[in-house]
Amino acid sequence: IKTIIEDTYKLYGFYPLDTPIIEYSSVLLAKAGGETEKQIYRFNKGDNDLSLRFDLTVPLAKYVSARYNELSFPFKRYQIGKVFRGERPQKGRFREFYQCDIDVIGDGELSLMYDAEIPSIIYDIFTKMNIGKFVIRINSRKILNGFFENLNLSDKYQDILRIIDKMEKVSEEDLIDMLKEINLTN
C-alpha cells in the first residue's frame, strides 16, 4: 500500500520529505490553541521540553521556513510517517497512526490546479489499490473551477454549476439535454 501511495505521489511530481518524530514542544505549540496541547505527547529529557509530532504539517512549516531561500516554488512534497496523539482513544481515533500527507507550498498565490490535482491523486491511488467502487465528494466551488480549468471548460463554468445544482431534481434525460444545450456531451 505504501509503495502504491508513494509511487503515485512521485508521478504527480511530489518530492519525498522526512521530518523528525521528536520536536521541541515550543515548535509544535507555536500559534496553536489549547486543543493542540491536549493532543501532544510531551516529555522532558534533561532541560529539553520535547513532544512527539501530532501531524506532519508543523514540521513541514519548520522545514520550509529554515530552507525558504533554497527551495524552488511551488514546492511539492509528500511524507508518509507516524504521528502521535495524546488524546483519549475512541472509535476511529488512535494514539499512533500513519499519516499520508501531500502539500504544495507557494511563495505567492497558487493556481487552483493544485487543489484540483488532489482528487486525481486520490482517484489514482484508490484505483491502483483495487478497493472497488468509491466516491470522492468535493465541497468547494474553487476546486471545482480548477477541474474545469484543467478540462479547458472555464468559459462554461457557471452553466455547468447551474446544471450540477439541478442534478438531484431532474431526470438523467433532462440532465443530458441541459449538457447538450451548452455543447457538452459524453
Regions found by a protein language model. Name each.
Residues 1-186:
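Extended, charged alpha-beta segments that form solvent-exposed binding/catalytic grooves
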